[in-house]
């Protein structure tokens, strides 16, 4: 399998939306209820176009017989927002100061067909390297329960468990994780 990681562009958004839905429903069902997943897809998970505009969101394209297919996506941010798509409440688009703040690792999703092949780790390496190039020496994220094992294996530590409010009294458990260089 030939794999290439590149910056996401606006024309990728429809494919990213499909990928995110497939990833959430196909890989996170063991950690969350169907109701949590559907509400999270409406309120939390999805494309953050600010990451694409900032040039800090990446896609991994697998080159198959029919041409390139987006197998995974993920990014980092120099902004205060820790998680969430364009329609997530509580967004903070203010810029971070790399001398004092941690870069945010954001919105990692792998299509179930391409899961557990090291693609998420590859995108994470690209994101961390880009954040370091921008002057950051610390990283943090709001990880899904499904993603925690990957991030632990990549040197992140759990800081606290949090609940992201959804609707109808539901919430989405996530784990605040950090990594220092």
What function would you assign to each model-found segment?
Residues 61-65:
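Core beta-strand residues in small-molecule sensory/regulatory alpha/beta domains
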Residues 117, 121, 133, 145-161, ...:
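Conserved active-site alpha-helix within GNAT-family acetyltransferase domains
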Residues 56-60:
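Hydrophobic beta-strand residues of extracellular immunoglobulin-like
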Residues 21-47:
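Conserved GNAT-fold acetyl-CoA-binding loop/helix
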Residues 1-14:
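Conserved N-terminal entry element of GNAT/NAT acetyltransferase domains
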Residues 54, 68-115, 125, 130, ...:
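Conserved acyl-donor/pantetheine-binding loop and adjacent beta-alpha core of acyl/acetyltransferases
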Residues 124, 131-144:
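Conserved GNAT acetyl-CoA-binding A-motif
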């Amino acid at each position: 399998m030939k794999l290439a990681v590149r910056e996401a562009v606006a024309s990728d958004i429809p494919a990213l939306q499909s990928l995110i839905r497939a990833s959430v429903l196909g890989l996170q069902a063991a950690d969350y209820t169907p109701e949590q997943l559907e509400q999270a897809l409406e309120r939390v998970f999805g494309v953050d176009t600010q990451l694409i505009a900032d040039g800090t969101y990446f896609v991994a394209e697998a080159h198959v017989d029919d041409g390139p297919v987006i197998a995974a996506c993920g990014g980092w941010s120099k902004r205060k927002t820790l998680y969430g798509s364009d329609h997530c409440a509580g967004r903070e688009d203010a810029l971070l100061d790399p001398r004092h703040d941690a870069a945010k690792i954001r919105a990692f999703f792998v299509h179930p067909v391409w899961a557990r092949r090291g693609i998420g780790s590859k995108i994470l390496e690209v994101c961390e390297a880009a954040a370091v190039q921008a002057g950051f020496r610390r990283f943090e994220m709001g990880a899904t329960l499904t993603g925690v094992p990957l991030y632990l294996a990549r040197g992140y530590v759990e800081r606290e468990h949090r609940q992201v409010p959804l609707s109808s009294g539901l919430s989405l458990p996530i784990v605040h994780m950090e990594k220092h260089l």
